[in-house]
From Swiss-Prot:
F-type ATPases have 2 components, CF(1) - the catalytic core - and CF(0) - the membrane proton channel. CF(1) has five subunits: alpha(3), beta(3), gamma(1), delta(1), epsilon(1). CF(0) has three main subunits: a, b and c. It comes from Bacillus velezensis (strain DSM 23117 / BGSC 10A6 / LMG 26770 / FZB42). Produces ATP from ADP in the presence of a proton gradient across the membrane. The gamma chain is believed to be important in regulating ATPase activity and the flow of protons through the CF(0) complex. It is found in: Cell membrane. Belongs to the ATPase gamma chain family. GO terms for molecular function: ATP binding; proton-transporting ATP synthase activity, rotational mechanism. PROSITE patterns: ATPASE_GAMMA. GO terms for biological process: proton motive force-driven plasma membrane ATP synthesis. Keywords: ATP synthesis, Cell membrane, CF(1), Hydrogen ion transport, Ion transport, Membrane, Transport. GO terms for cellular component: plasma membrane; proton-transporting ATP synthase complex. This is ATP synthase gamma chain. It comes from the Bacteria. InterPro entries: ATP_synth_F1_ATPase_gsu, ATP_synth_F1_gsu, ATP_synth_F1_gsu_CS. It is a peripheral membrane protein.
């Protein structure tokens, strides 16, 4: 049995740890609130640009923009979104496990795919396994602005247009609620499906100067918005996962403290009983 000093030391250290995890839980809750607000605020813009792109794309019968045309898939790019830090439960491991399994199942060689890594955890994961990384972005912070990822998104879209890869898939954690996040894979390029408009145009447009030039500007913005929206979604998921992980850690610490306190009291009671027994035994020996 551990000594009273050892048990007391463990109780003290566990209490200090629980104070840290409790503080991290509260910080993550505040960050989650802001991240969720940012994601929800971006949703109306995303819905509107999707509607406009759908209507313009359906109306421009003669448009042959490369972002709208499916081609033979020789190489697929996977844009994988993770965090820069850990202590977020299964947030990173679940999305990386899904991305890794998908790549292994779909591709026979490294020439058939490439990875675009957002987040230090994901970047390090793919580097460790010597998987091809086309580009990376780390150190974004807790509140991401479009300006921070503008270069990456534009380069990614341009590389697709230039033929560096033939499909682009997003792999990230979709925010469902504070206690639930779902790993999501979404094909971004080529833009062959504009969502839930039922295949019917909801508006018609007159193009000036023509539909080709309108799509030349609109389609890259739409693809970039899809990536940015997924990143906002992932950030909310990250803070939710970290808040949940820290809450679980705090609860576990409390249970451990209760268990250690019980062990401490039992050990102390046993020590007192032993001392009383020795005193009584010594007194009896003197009689």
């Amino acid at each position: 049995m551990a000594s009273l000093r050892d048990i007391k030391s463990r109780i003290t250290s566990t209490k200090k740890t629980s104070q840290i995890t409790k503080a991290m839980q509260m910080v993550s809750a505040a960050k989650l609130n802001r991240a969720e607000t940012n994601a929800k605020s971006f949703a109306p813009y995303m819905d509107k640009i999707q509607e406009v792109v759908f209507n313009v794309g359906k109306g421009a019968k003669n448009a042959k923009h490369p972002m709208l045309v499916s081609r033979e898939v020789k190489k697929t790019a996977y844009l994988v979104i993770t965090s820069d830090r850990g202590l977020a439960g299964a947030f990173n491991s679940s999305v990386l496990r899904n991305a890794y399994r998908t790549i292994q199942e779909r591709h026979q060689s490294k020439d058939e795919y490439t990875v675009i890594a957002i987040g230090r955890v994901g970047r390090d994961f793919f580097k460790k396994r010597e998987m091809p990384i086309l580009s990376e972005l780390v150190g974004l912070g807790d509140e991401v602005t479009f300006a921070q990822i503008k270069d990456l998104t534009r380069q990614t879209v341009q590389m697709f247009i230039d033929g560096a890869f033939d499909e682009l898939h997003l792999v990230y954690n979709h925010f469902v609620s504070a206690i639930s996040q779902e790993v999501t894979e979404k094909k971004v390029l080529p833009l062959t499906d504009f969502g839930t408009s039922g295949g019917k145009r909801t508006a018609s447009y007159e193009f000036e100067p023509d539909e080709e030039e309108v799509l030349e500007v609109l389609l890259p913005q739409y693809a970039e918005s899809l990536i940015y929206g997924a990143l906002l979604d992932s950030k909310a998921s990250e803070h939710a996962a970290r808040m949940t992980a820290m809450k679980n850690a705090t609860d576990n610490a409390k249970e451990l403290i209760d268990s250690l306190s019980l062990s401490y009291n039992r050990a102390r009671q046993a020590a007192i009983t032993q001392e009383i027994t020795e005193i009584v035994g010594g007194a009896a020996a003197l009689e």
